[in-house]
Amino acid sequence: MINSSISSKLTFIIDYQPIVETLNIGVVGSCATLGCWQEPVAMQRVGIRRWRVDVDYGSLPDSFEFKFVVFDPSTSHINLWEDGDNRIFSKRSDEASGRYKAVFRGTLDWHGAGVAVPVFSLRRRNGWGVGEFTDLCLLADWCVATHQKIIQILPVNDTNISFDDTDSYPYRSVSIYALNPIYVNIDKIGEIKDTNLLREFEQERRRLDEQHRVQYSDVLRLKLSVLRQLYREQRADAALYDTLRRTLFSFEQRNGWLLPYAVFRCLADDFGTGNFYAWGDWASADETKIRRYATDNAEKVEFYYFVQYHLFKQFREAKSYLNAHSIYLKGDIPVGVGRLSVDVWQYPHLFNTDKQAGAPPDDFSDQGQNWGFPTYNWANMSKDAYSWWRQRFSFMQTLFDAIRIDHILGFFRIWEIPLTVSSGLLGYFSPALPLSVEEIRQYKLPVDEKYILRYSDGKELIVTDTDNVLFIEDPYKPAHYHPRIMARKTQAYKGLTSDEQEVFDRLYNDYFYRRHNEFWQQSALNKLPVILDDIDMLVCGEDLGMVPASVPDVMRQLNILSLEVLRMPKEMGTEFVVPDRVPYNSVVTTGTHDTSTLRMWWSEDRDRVRR
């Protein structure tokens, strides 16, 4: 993309893979300002993969050729010229905005080893029964000693809505911004002055630290109790509180999400439930009411500012430590948000709250998956150029160097299940091109009411309800139908004649594997380029499962790394991924958060692993 400007400078921005610290990205070209093809102009690193440089616009000729290069700044020796023809810039033909942004063409074959681990597993001696953000520094020391470059963690957002062990699921966030209090290091905040309470808290801390497994709800309960006491004591100290109050006010001013999150948390405390549908007049968020509540309940609201302030302070200090030791931190963006979340409460128009996301059946789950998240209303999101998503990624960029997009297939299409249904078997892809009655008849198949499942009556359905149906009516387009997933296993299919079965198989295969290729490709291209436009993180997509044929091309086009799991090869007829066959722009791993760990896998399947 070329943009120029009748301004004092022209800014070059290039995205490229990580490179070794001794090398630099530069721009070199046919004019003196760009080194006459000999002396590259050094660019400055502004992210894990983004580089930029400003050059004097007036010193550039009306037209010139150039390329981006990798070079050694100490000698100006060019190690790598980008592929393809020279880039051409013309002041006469190019639009004005002072910016030229592109992706480097070619590769230097940089590789980086790393480790994926949940933060809760990083337990240190004399801890609180769970890993904490500060423990990432200890892991970084180990990575340095073992020559690793990347630490990948599971999502660390606040997930606490029921305050029991179900809240430990890291992919159902209460807020896409707030961090989970379970990861705070209490010792870094201060010490309880009340000796009786201190003794009581210390006794419980030791008990939890001695447990072999994380006692999630007990640890969270203890930490929140200690945090409340610390806040009360610090608030009671006039001199200390004056500084604290100003610090928290500044933190709130820099984070627009914090006020509604804190009020949401307080209302959940007030009503004794995080189910905001049971909050009466508060069932829907209102900015004026939120601000009034915060004014009337300043101390309660400020407590949640206090918690989040220390969480972010500790997280950023840990990340700074990692980066200072040349370790990149990779985060994880879940495919959905919790149904009972601040985001759904504030922006219900962005979600289909009568639907839920999941995944179709596969070799690992014959019933499919139902994650329970509301699906996204992409039509409404597109009205402001996906600002909710753009803000989400921009915020993640302040925390991480690289990001994993969980279930990137959801940007192409999502497996959608009505709220009245529990099984993933009863879903359909959305968006989709459901079949009309005429199209089904063209296959010489009977359009019999007994073979059709309708959701329009709103009654709750169970798996056996679908055993005698071949089609599911589309909820958005009446009289249009999706073939029922895994239809060959139904009694309805077995009741067809052999000729009808053969015809249905053709319809089914065309529908799921060919019909939507271009449609889903365009669906993703409508969203992802806009959402990722200003992101300089290294982006990886979790492209596992029932993958549309268009996914790899879109990911290559957008420079998104694929995920290759050693024990889950994408190539048919192979038992394991062959590393030298995977694309360069990929992350190769021995497993995911849904599989056993490397050590467990080695122990549980020794004969297969040894092959």
What are these regions (language model features)?
Residues L10-D15:
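A short, amphipathic beta-strand motif
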Residues S7-K9, Q44, N323:
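Secondary-structure boundary/capping motif
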Residues D62-F66:
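Exposed beta-strand face motif in extracellular beta-rich ectodomains
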Residues M1-S5, V55-D56, S90-R611:
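Catalytic cores of glycan-processing enzymes that make or break glycosidic bonds
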Residues Y16-P61, F71-D94, W128:
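Aromatic-rich carbohydrate-binding modules that target alpha-glucans
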Residues V69-F71, I408:
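Short, loop-centered acidic/histidine patches that primarily coordinate divalent metals
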Residues G26, K67-V69, Q152:
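Short, conserved beta-strand segments within well-ordered enzyme catalytic domains
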